Amino acid sequence: MIEVLANDRLGKKIKVKCMPTDTIGDLKKIISLQIGTSYEKIVLKKGYQVYKDHITLDDYEVHNGFNFELYYS
């Protein structure tokens, strides 16, 4: 179990506990439940890297304490 953070840079930081085998799409669904926004409208980025829904956190080498940038589309 790892804990990751999503920051929308508007004052909202979301902590999420998930497994390394979860996909980015699964992570978006968990975040959407906490913020009340549809998961289809969430975009997770880090720098210029946009994370794709079907790839696992382990494949992206996301570790405990990782910070995502949360954007709305």
UniProtKB/Swiss-Prot annotation:
Keywords: Ubl conjugation pathway
GO terms for cellular component: cytoplasm; nucleus
Domain named Ubiquitin-like: residues: 1-73
SUPFAM superfamilies assigned: Ubiquitin-like
The organism's place on the tree of life at top rank: Eukaryota
Record CDD domains: Ubl_UBL5
Gene Ontology molecular-function annotations: protein tag activity
Protein name: Ubiquitin-like modifier HUB1
Organism from which the protein derives: Debaryomyces hansenii (strain ATCC 36239 / CBS 767 / BCRC 21394 / JCM 1990 / NBRC 0083 / IGC 2968)
